[in-house]
């Protein structure tokens, strides 16, 4: 039976109606600070914790509830003779329900408050009460989420007590709540400047907080269950995780993966760009004067694969672009926005998933990334692989000309474009590019020459006069020979093979320009 509740919350959503229902059941409510004032102002009978413990708040509120009369009332095991004797001897009444949520630490960090102001928002008494109540869940209920108020109030109104199952479920939620809170603190401190750059990027203990955004219909395949979890803080750069879904069917596991691949690839470009993704791999990428032109050119690279694909654009979609998009069956489109005419046209495709990420139209240099957003995490059974995200980029001046002939200005433009694309293709990756669009893509092969052959075989556009990007060096000259045979005139690659001299000799013999970036872009 719930006779007494301690209520102290930062998030006061639904607080007063819930407290009134408790009071109507005759539950004595203990409270502190702002929560106590809010309840008293609403006419809810409330007892100050300071009056209850006969120990007023001290240190400007830093110590309020850290008292044996509070924690003894929460933690004592009902029915255990030794515990009953202890609380009776010390006049400690039972506290049967603890309703607490914690100081808004994450909000303070997100608001960019100074370091010590953020530290001041680290709750001490709240987590202690939550953990005490959760540990004693056999006898005490603990509520950390306003979404549970209705359920708890209804159950108490029906039986004056909480069932074992309800207390257990609330216990799980409470420990998850405090764990997430502590992880957020750890993440914040890890992000502080350190003299050890490696320790800052890869701390001894990695704590990350993700909240369940929802269940998915299934995972990668129907026999695999799936769910989507979102980070506690929205990144400054545009992301799929925080993009706004405007219409369409529920996003699937594969949709989310493909959307992220499309978004990552289109974010490489400051010019008007479009990326078409299929099975997490680009099948067409193009720049254009307008979004409509960029999409039409990207689609033309591999129109068969584009069917049922995912499209990312880095400029708002207008009526002309919408017309092009509606001419093809697509799963998803993500863009910075859509004008009224575009929304009307795309709205006719009821199942088409439209996502909006407004900052996608902004220059990449305008996005800031926190240290945790510079990491890429991949799970393996029993462990986690962590590395820096591949944000490596090169300029013309960073490259070294390997051959007798240097690229022309037009070739340079296409080479740098191909280099931005090839890092998003599964290794071994080869991209043929011409006039700032892909004309042939080959990836996922176990030998580089086979990726070249795949790109040539799949090409729907003229390869003569094209340029080629390779995500890693050519281990043999055979790949370059196949590129020359296809009609390409310039190649960009990392360089560094022991057979570079043979590869360069083959390029020179065909008057093909080749440059080395000194940077590899493997993608597994």
UniProtKB/Swiss-Prot annotation:
Keyword terms, alphabetized: Hydrolase, Multifunctional enzyme, Purine biosynthesis, Transferase
Catalyses which reaction(s): (6R)-10-formyltetrahydrofolate + 5-amino-1-(5-phospho-beta-D-ribosyl)imidazole-4-carboxamide = 5-formamido-1-(5-phospho-D-ribosyl)imidazole-4-carboxamide + (6S)-5,6,7,8-tetrahydrofolate; IMP + H2O = 5-formamido-1-(5-phospho-D-ribosyl)imidazole-4-carboxamide
GO BP, one annotated term: 'de novo' IMP biosynthetic process
Gene Ontology terms, MF aspect: IMP cyclohydrolase activity; phosphoribosylaminoimidazolecarboxamide formyltransferase activity
One Pfam family here: MGS
Domain of life according to the entry: Bacteria
Residue span, MGS-like domain: 1-144
Pathway: Purine metabolism; IMP biosynthesis via de novo pathway; 5-formamido-1-(5-phospho-D-ribosyl)imidazole-4-carboxamide from 5-amino-1-(5-phospho-D-ribosyl)imidazole-4-carboxamide (10-formyl THF route): step 1/1; Purine metabolism; IMP biosynthesis via de novo pathway; IMP from 5-formamido-1-(5-phospho-D-ribosyl)imidazole-4-carboxamide: step 1/1
PROSITE patterns per the UniProt record, alphabetical: MGS
This protein's domain notes: The IMP cyclohydrolase activity resides in the N-terminal region.
Protein name: Bifunctional purine biosynthesis protein PurH
Species, as recorded: Anaeromyxobacter sp. (strain Fw109-5)
Gene: purH
